A protein has these predicted regions:
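Histidine-rich, glycine-flanked metal-binding segment
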Residues: 1-2, 8-48
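Charged helix-capping and loop-helix junction motifs
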Residues: 68-71, 102-107
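Divalent metal-dependent hydrolysis catalytic cores, especially in the metallo-beta-lactamase
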Residues: 57, 73-102, 115
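Glycine/Thr-rich phosphate-binding loops of Rossmann-like dinucleotide-binding domains
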Residues: 30, 62, 97
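Structural detector for hydrophobic anchor residues on beta-strands
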Residues: 3-4, 87
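Short, intrinsically disordered, charge-balanced linker/junction segments flanking boundaries
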Residues: 106-115
Length: 115
């Protein structure tokens, strides 16, 4: 896919208008020539890398401390819908046994959330 004319956040901290070539859901080049790939007109939009949420207790009424895989999936769908591509589940001050369960649940849900 080619994303045409989007304002790309660059390494120097500026936005520059570029065409972006995406393959297998990853940016592989900028200023790519238009080909027979799908073209998305992104004129007037900004393109930034996926964001990392380094402190998340949960979302949508769910908390990582609930040890509920379906709840964690809902949290991940919410985060993905808001540009978050990586996260660090944050717990409360709890027993070691409870923390093991919390992070095992997060690991089980990781990569399987729809959305």
């Amino acid at each position: 896919m080619i994303i045409k004319g989007t304002s790309v956040f660059c390494e120097d901290g500026t936005f520059q208008v570029k065409d972006v070539f995406v393959e297998d859901h990853k940016i592989v080049a900028t200023e790519a020539e238009v080909s027979d790939k799908t073209v998305v007109d992104a004129n007037g939009y900004k393109l930034i890398p996926g964001l990392v949420d380094v402190h998340s207790h949960g979302a949508c009424g769910h908390d990582f401390c609930d040890c509920d895989v379906e709840g964690v999936k809902e949290i991940l769908r919410f985060e993905k819908a808001h540009g978050i591509t990586s996260y660090c589940p944050t717990s409360m001050t709890l027993s070691k046994e409870m923390l093991v369960d919390i992070f095992a649940t997060a690991k089980e849900a990781d990569g399987i959330a729809d959305g």
